């Protein structure tokens, strides 16, 4: 049976990833306990990469059983685990808040972001017409945990933002062509890691630049409907 074959093949990949994760976790510990923090760090990055790959595999595993509602149940679990906030600010700007820093560009990183952001956007706009911002600025605000100041020096060019822009474009942009939307990137300290994305009309961008310096630690209130 094709479904069973795909299911078991995917399960085998999950088991292989978990085995490699166990090996990397042991290596992370060994190098740390033996005073080689640099190599422990390198191994921890590899462990994180394997973990992301395992997550992508386990997310599709329930659907391969053929069970009715598997995708919806998986989306619900993702929503509970990664509660993405979507809405409009009081000024009428569209915003998305992701409770994590975006990963670096790597194999599987776009799929990982798509798996939680697209369902959140789809749910928010269900029964609502798309909102099209023209001549706007797409601002990415990377909020890092202030207890981890080394994250302030993130290389914005190496962060996986393209898939976020693509998903936002489906609902709030005519497209992401430079003539329609400019991009702006900044970092700020906060109580915990998160990523804030704002879609702002260009004539409002100077106002946003001023407000950005004093945004609340947990982010501004977001509304279901656009008031402006």
Regions found by a protein language model. Give the residues of each.
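Short, hydrophobic/π-rich interface segment
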Residues: 145-187
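N-terminal targeting/trafficking signals and adjacent low-complexity tails
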Residues: 1-75, 81-83, 89-93
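Extended Gly/Ser/Thr-rich low-complexity repeat segments
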Residues: 107-112, 211-213
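Amphipathic alpha-helical interaction surfaces
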Residues: 60-63, 127, 167-171
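Short amphipathic
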Residues: 83-102, 139-144
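C-terminal edge-of-domain segments
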Residues: 177-225
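Short glycine/proline-enriched loop/turn "hinge" motifs that connect secondary-structure elements
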Residues: 86-90, 129-134, 189
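An N-terminal amphipathic alpha-helical segment
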Residues: 110-139, 146-148
């Amino acid at each position: 049976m094709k479904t069973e074959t795909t299911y078991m093949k995917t399960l085998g990949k999950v088991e292989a990833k978990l085995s490699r994760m166990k090996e990397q976790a042991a290596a992370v510990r060994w190098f740390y306990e033996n005073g080689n923090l640099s190599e422990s760090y390198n191994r921890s990055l590899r462990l994180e990469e394997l973990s992301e790959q395992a997550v992508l595999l386990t997310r599709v595993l329930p659907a391969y059983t053929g069970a009715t509602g598997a995708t919806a149940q998986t989306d619900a679990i993702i929503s509970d685990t990664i509660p993405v906030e979507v809405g409009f600010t009081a000024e009428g700007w569209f915003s998305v808040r992701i409770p994590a820093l975006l990963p670096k560009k790597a194999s599987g990183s776009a799929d990982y972001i798509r798996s939680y952001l697209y369902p959140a956007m789809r749910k928010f706009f269900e029964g609502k017409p798309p909102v099209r911002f023209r001549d706007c600025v797409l601002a990415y605000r990377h909020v890092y945990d202030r207890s981890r100041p080394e994250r302030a020096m993130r290389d914005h060019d190496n962060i996986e933002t393209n898939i976020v822009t693509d998903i936002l474009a489906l609902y709030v942009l005519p497209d992401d062509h430079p003539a329609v939307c400019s991009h702006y990137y900044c970092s700020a300290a906060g109580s915990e890691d998160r990523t804030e994305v704002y879609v702002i009309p260009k004539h409002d961008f100077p106002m946003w630049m001023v407000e950005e310096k004093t945004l609340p630690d947990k982010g501004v209130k977001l509304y279901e409907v656009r008031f402006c």
